[in-house]
Amino acid sequence: MTILETQGLAARNAGRVLAVAGTAAKNAALEAAAKAIEARQDEILAANAEDMAAAKAAGMRPALVDRLALDEGRIAGIVEGVRQVAALPDPIGQVVKMDTRPNGLVIGRRRVPLGVIGIIYEARPNVTVDAAALCLKSGNAVILRGGKEAFRSNKAFVAVLRDALESAGLPRDCVALVEDTSRESANELMNLTDYLDVLIPRGGAGLIQSVVKNARVPVIQTGVGVCHVYVHEGADLDMAARIIHNAKTSRPSVCNAAECLLVDRAVAPDFLPMAWQLLQTKNVELRGCPETRAILGDFVRPAEDADWDTEFGDYILAVKVVSGFDEAVDFIAAHGTGHSEAIVTADYFAAQRFLDEVDAAAVYVNASTRFTDGFEFGLGAEIGISTQKMHARGPMGLEELTSSKYVIYGTGQIR
């Protein structure tokens, strides 16, 4: 067996134990993990400092360095996230439906774990803990394969988590890390059908497309966010300016950040200078259509066709003036990724049409796309934002990491 197959078998065996562990046992393991992360914070930060130094030396973009970085505040947030997951209701064993048939059979559906989950993700060490916590609470074993840029941080976190599991009486192998960060190991994980029940990629478009194209393990597609904010002619322009500023600049590297601003022609001459005044405080680069450049000037870079389909993950915003509602919705249908879309308007009927006609996991009226997040939706930490329609859509919390099985009670019925 290969190293990865050995890990897969160990995870499968550990998962059988975890699947029938009670809520109290799982919560005790999560609390042990939270305390262990706090106690071994210096060890984790030292590992992260090595990752950060290597990333900067390699010329990693600042927005990506921000994703990689850990500090005491971020670790405190990670620990709080683990405790929030522990406090959430346990979905395992919940009876979704129960009916009595005419022949006396009592047939119900009960939530059960998916089994063993593989997660492939980029240089975001917080994902290591968020994913492990969610998988543990939902009764799933997990095999983690993070980006090489965060390898030392991920290894430190997983060592802490495995020790915490053991101290709480659960198998260490409920959480495993693929230590080989080569492309070959990623390909092997994508095809580990004997041991993995589902594969979840978290990262940019390139990573997700590679997994979808090459995996034989079933995939839940997450992440790519070409998100739009559409300023309707009926918008409160001050509100709209605040929303696009937040949606673009509060954390541009994440998948729920806005990448494209659409503005009705009727309000563009008034709105675009207001928006630009706010956006320039964060040195946002605008890439605009000809009408945008006619209003704001030549310092706006001409938008190329590819810009309308790009998740920039940086302080870059594509801007297009549209003739009205229909063009805006058609544009989103052509260029959006089904993640998060927002309209700013005081027009009730326009808002309702937008909610009805825009096909995305999260559709907003008068709010920033940045709220598409497990914590903000009351789910606790999320494993990712699913942009597909099968199995799960939107922030994937505990329930989205379960399946169901039918349970049937009889009194001797035969057919």
Predicted regions and their residues:
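N-terminal Rossmann-like NAD(P)+-binding subdomain of aldehyde/semialdehyde dehydrogenases
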Residues: 1-107
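Flexible, glycine/charged-enriched surface loops at secondary-structure junctions
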Residues: 21-27, 92, 168-175, 251-257, ...
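C-terminal core of ALDH-fold dehydrogenases
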Residues: 274, 325, 330-415
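ALDH superfamily catalytic-core signature
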Residues: 2, 123-126, 130-141, 156, ...
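Short beta-strand-to-turn element immediately C-terminal to the catalytic PLP-Schiff-base lysine
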Residues: 230-234, 261-265, 321-322, 344-346, ...
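Rossmann-like NAD(P) dinucleotide-binding subdomain of oxidoreductase/dehydrogenase enzymes
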Residues: 87, 96-238
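Short, well-ordered beta-strand elements within core beta-sheets of diverse protein domains
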Residues: 14-20, 261-263, 314-323, 338-343
